[in-house]
From Swiss-Prot:
Its main location: mitochondrion. Component of the mitochondrial ribosome (mitoribosome), a dedicated translation machinery responsible for the synthesis of mitochondrial genome-encoded proteins, including at least some of the essential transmembrane subunits of the mitochondrial respiratory chain. The mitoribosomes are attached to the mitochondrial inner membrane and translation products are cotranslationally integrated into the membrane. Keywords: Mitochondrion, Ribonucleoprotein, Ribosomal protein. It comes from Saccharomyces cerevisiae (strain ATCC 204508 / S288c). GO terms for cellular component: mitochondrial inner membrane; mitochondrial small ribosomal subunit; mitochondrion. This is Small ribosomal subunit protein mS33. The gene is RSM27. InterPro entries: Ribosomal_mS33 (IPR013219). Residues 84-110 are annotated as: Disordered. GO terms for molecular function: structural constituent of ribosome. It comes from the Eukaryota.
């Protein structure tokens, strides 16, 4: 029971119309897969939060005469201090002369 290729293509085309799919018999890259996906714009925009909400640093710039207390910043600084006391803090920066000799750019030996 051989069915002509033209009839199979017609059936595939009708099936694509019924199920709202793209009919691409030649297999050309059309980008329809990407165009049919949901748009990512709203989810990306909502990831960064509402830009209209005032943040703490904005309050400090709007009202410089009022001394606000940033609890999150105080907590961060206390944790940094605790790490330093335990020897887990950031290393001290090298001085300019020490950095030059460490890289071999100091005085040259004859």
């Amino acid at each position: 029971m051989n069915v002509p290729k033209a009839r199979l293509l017609k059936v595939a085309e009708l099936s694509a119309k019924i199920f709202d799919q793209n009919f691409n018999p030649s297999g050309i890259r059309t980008g329809s897969k990407i165009l049919n996906e949901r748009l990512k714009g709203p989810s990306v925009a909502s990831y960064y939060g509402n830009p209209d909400i005032l943040k703490f640093r904005h309050l400090k710039t709007l009202y410089p005469d009022i001394e606000f207390v940033d609890l999150e910043e105080q907590y961060r600084l206390s944790m940094v201090e605790a790490k330093k006391r335990r020897g887990k803090g950031a290393p001290k920066k090298m001085k300019k002369d020490a950095a030059a000799t460490a890289k071999g750019k100091g005085k040259k030996k004859k």
